[in-house]
């Protein structure tokens, strides 16, 4: 997925869409732009925090995969759109420090977003009980990384969590 907020350029979105890349949107404007550019349904990921109800409504209307930022968003989303989609994702924040080798990349523990490890287990239990069938995990643990070492380290952490959640 391409983070639309990085470069909300219709021409770039068009090229990336043609190569099969979806859009990661963090606002109503980005959702509308991606949808207008022909990116549809599950090819749009909606990841936002402090989300107004009308943005959840629009994301659901266009079939975007909604990535919940907080455990309280489960009830808020259900009340807002009247149901929970069959596919939902949750943003994970493991807390502590995120490091590669001896370098501290960032401090997710200080971040304002994401489910804690305990909330991931509770959230997925709630979602499953409410009929959600497909689950995604999203995380963003460091900004402005300058090497590719970040990605396999993050992937390992997410896959280890997925195995535990199963």
Descriptions of predicted regions:
Residues 1-166:
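Active-site-proximal beta-alpha core segment in soluble small-molecule metabolic enzymes
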